[in-house]
Swiss-Prot record:
Family, similarity comment: Belongs to the class-II aminoacyl-tRNA synthetase family. ProS type 1 subfamily.
One GO cellular component, as annotated: cytosol
E.C. designation(s): 6.1.1.15
Enzyme class label: ligase
Listed PANTHER family: MITOCHONDRIAL RIBOSOME PROTEIN L39/PROLYL-TRNA LIGASE FAMILY MEMBER (PTHR42753), PROLINE--TRNA LIGASE (PTHR42753:SF2)
Role noted for this protein: Catalyzes the attachment of proline to tRNA(Pro) in a two-step reaction: proline is first activated by ATP to form Pro-AMP and then transferred to the acceptor end of tRNA(Pro). As ProRS can inadvertently accommodate and process non-cognate amino acids such as alanine and cysteine, to avoid such errors it has two additional distinct editing activities against alanine. One activity is designated as 'pretransfer' editing and involves the tRNA(Pro)-independent hydrolysis of activated Ala-AMP.
Protein name listed in UniProt: Proline--tRNA ligase
Main location: cytoplasm
Keywords: Aminoacyl-tRNA synthetase, ATP-binding, Cytoplasm, Ligase, Nucleotide-binding, Protein biosynthesis
Subunit structure and binding partners: Homodimer.
GO molecular function terms attached to this record: aminoacyl-tRNA deacylase activity; ATP binding; proline-tRNA ligase activity
Top-rank taxon, per record: Bacteria
Amino acid sequence: MRTSQFLLATQKETPSDAVVISHQLMLRAGMIRKLASGLYTWLPMGLRVMRKVEAIVREEMDAAGSLEVLMPSTQPAELWQESGRWEEYGPELLRIKDRHGRDFCAGPTHEEVITDLMRNELSSYKQLPINLYQIQTKFRDEIRPRFGLMRGREFIMKDSYSFHADQASLQVTYDRMHDAYCNIFTRLGLKFRPVEADNGSIGGAGSHEFHVLAESGEDDIVFSNGSDYAANIEKAEAVPRETSRAAPSEELRLVDTPDTKTIAALVEKFNLPIEKTIKTLIVHAEEEGKLIALIIRGDHELNEIKAANQPGVASPLVMASDAELRDAIGAGAGSLGPLNLPLPIIIDRSVELMSDFAIGANIDDKHYFGVNWERDLPVPTVADLRNVVAGDPSPDGKGTLEIKRGIEVGHIFQLGNKYSKAMKCEVLGENGKPVTLEMGCYGIGVSRVVAAAIEQNNDENGIIWSDALAPFQIALVPLRYETELVREATDKLYAELTAAGFEVLLDDRDKKTSPGIKFADMELIGIPHRIVVSDRGLAEGNLEYKSRTEGQAQALPVADVLSFLQARIRR
């Protein structure tokens, strides 16, 4: 491809509304253009990259035994009402009406559509298992679209769905898809981690997320430095560093604590170790009008997913208002504690191992110091309620936990029969009786992968693409292309490289475009390999080669360029 025949839409300046580096570089490199909030047009440069992602995804899905289909992006409300998600999904579901007043939605996901399809196509266990996938545009009406393609409203996604007669069959396919996802992200040249995850609104049992490691990531991912244990922050099990509770060494005493509504104020005023304090958080119970107390250590953060999964706790988690606290307890949020608290109590594992600690007295501006379990109050229900912190023991007993930032680019779920049961997706089993199918679903944010790859691979000059993702593998940059010697050598090499199967961008812009601008554009776009043709180099029988990831250029004999690139570029 010659630049004279291509839409080369690079920009020198960074748009003011682009915050994250992937958004900035995709705009500057001429990959995308904004149409409206959360909506982007893919220009030829960007689309070439996305097609590379799609091709690798298709190859690995096909190899894993998944069959490609294409479902409508507009979905009838009846299916979502049947599954129960029409109201559950919330305002992110864009609801529309046709001219006849019938309700539809712009599909954010396709569990209902695929389940409806399969209940009409499958009749016998002999047709199972089956795994279907599509690559298609989705729409989620994000309240605040931001970060370019990282959190847009319209995006490209690969979603696949599998159907099984039993859990054992589902597990086999789930493991196969897990491996396929690892293959995909490895082939894309990304540093990534699969982590255990919570199923969220999709429902079902087990799930894993796939995160591209990047400091700009929105998610915390947790992994052991001594094993392959990994989970997202919502799912990671918090194991106390302490193994036993120390014996009491202080007497219980009631202390006046004016102007200490926060843990930080209490610690500073009374010179307490923060590890000797607790947070008492009051939340709504499942039973209407009831409240439950959740208690974590003062230096820990409540994990709202874990908390909402506790028996009796309302989901999603709802904190009690100040009026509710005063009505039920008689004190405000800064003075609460478990002693004489007239509510059910759940404490974190770390709290169970505390001794001589400070708690609110359930009286404004008063705390108890020197509190000890069993001596002063019984140990209530104990559960894992907090977020892990770096240095916690790994739940598998091997090593300690580290935390890094990640960008979620894939998610696989074992759905169980959540949708198939609600929508009566059944086949006749081996014994001739109806069997409700077990389902799995598996998603990759194809357009998000492009942005995530840039977040992970960039420098001050622009994008750094892997050979697998680059829009072009080679930038061929002639200096003084208007001269016969340079033009003939450039055209000859261009023909040889393209005939050998390389994707080459020949920068044939005229002399009004300086060499510096040409080099800067190729680095901004992120083309991995650059060949410079100049009359000076040709006079010595050489061309100049430079890798996007290496600082120094090197001279190559003209006759050796093709073999050098064939050995260098991962095909």
